[in-house]
């Protein structure tokens, strides 16, 4: 029996002119979403799952190297109310409508190629993909690396990743401020990058409690992490706030090392700071819908995090809990968010 969708989710997904929405779904809900003739699909990300047999052959799919905290296969589904068409250019595949494109690439993460070279090559392929689709403004990146904090020939893999991303962005990124991104470590499968891009750029938002990540001091590596803390993307009828992976960092330093409760409190304070900064640009409304992705170093952390998020967001959020390594070994949790507000 197919699981039904909430009236609010249906309204957001199907309002004429609304470009896109994201849903985190188990297998039964994913089947319902993907079989609905009133929706088109931009892309699907699987967690703890390979491509399901109920997915249309033309639907872009990427298997992420992260596992759901529940142990049950989960799917991240980007749907569109505008017709989509599949597109594949070189190693990058995805789908687009007239305003937005979803794409994904598997990293060539092998022993005989330096990670920074593989990352640079992948990002340059992404920029080639965007140029050919005509949707040239990247608005959100997700970078999922296996063994993200492991040492690789004397240099942490995440630092090598940042070197490669920095090279590609220096060569091809049009905007002076980099887009929102997350970087999280996985434990199985293949390292992947997936992304959203649009015809029009998003407006960057920074956190007054933190140093901009792209301005971090060199103690974090020879190349700073090139991402913004948040941004607002405006489409026809929807305002979308993207919040990057957010953790217990103040200034540029980790706070509450080894203290889960302290890190939860600091992380939610950073989320509140970003929401306040965004609301100075775009007022929220009672129709706001939140989709949260929570990365847990240990799945036992889920219950206290869930309690904190329920206190902060109530029933207005759709959370997905994933087992993943944060890009600093002293961070226990990381939370990212998408808020969609129907304008008018």
Regions found by a protein language model. Give the residues of each.
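N-terminal presequence-like segments and the immediate start of the first folded domain
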Residues: 1-344
């Amino acid at each position: 029996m197919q699981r039904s969708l909430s009236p609010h989710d249906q309204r957001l997904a199907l309002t004429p002119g609304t470009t896109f929405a994201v849903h985190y779904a188990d297998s039964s809900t994913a089947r319902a979403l993907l079989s609905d003739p009133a929706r088109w699909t931009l892309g699907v990300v699987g967690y703890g799952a390979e491509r399901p047999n109920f997915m249309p052959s033309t639907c872009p799919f990427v298997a992420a190297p992260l596992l759901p905290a529940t142990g049950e296969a989960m799917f991240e589904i980007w749907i569109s109310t505008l017709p989509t068409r599949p597109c594949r250019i070189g190693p990058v595949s995805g789908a687009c409508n007239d305003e937005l494109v979803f794409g994904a690439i598997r990293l060539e993460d092998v022993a005989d190629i330096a990670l920074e070279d593989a990352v640079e090559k992948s990002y340059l392929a992404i920029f080639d993909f965007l140029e050919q689709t005509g949707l040239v403004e990247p608005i959100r990146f997700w970078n999922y690396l296996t063994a993200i904090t492991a040492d690789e020939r004397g240099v942490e893999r995440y630092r090598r990743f940042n070197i490669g991303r920095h090279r590609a962005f220096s060569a091809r990124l049009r905007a002076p401020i980099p887009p929102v991104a997350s970087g999280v470590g996985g434990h199985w499968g293949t390292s992947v990058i997936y992304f959203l891009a649009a015809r029009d750029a998003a407006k960057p938002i920074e956190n007054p409690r933190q140093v901009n990540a792209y301005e971090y001091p060199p103690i974090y590596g020879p190349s700073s992490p090139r991402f913004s803390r948040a941004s607002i993307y405006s489409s026809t009828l929807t305002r979308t706030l993207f919040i990057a992976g957010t953790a217990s960092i103040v200034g540029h330093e980790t706070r509450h090392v080894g203290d889960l409760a302290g890190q939860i409190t600091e992380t939610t304070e950073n989320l509140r700071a970003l929401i306040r900064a965004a609301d100075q640009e775009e007022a929220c409304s009672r129709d706001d819908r939140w989709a949260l992705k929570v990365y847990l170093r240990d799945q036992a952390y889920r219950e206290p995090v869930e309690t904190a998020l329920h206190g902060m967001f109530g029933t207005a959020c759709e959370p997905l809990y994933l087992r993943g390594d944060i890009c600093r070994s002293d961070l226990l949790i990381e939370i990212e968010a998408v808020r969609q507000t129907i304008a008018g």
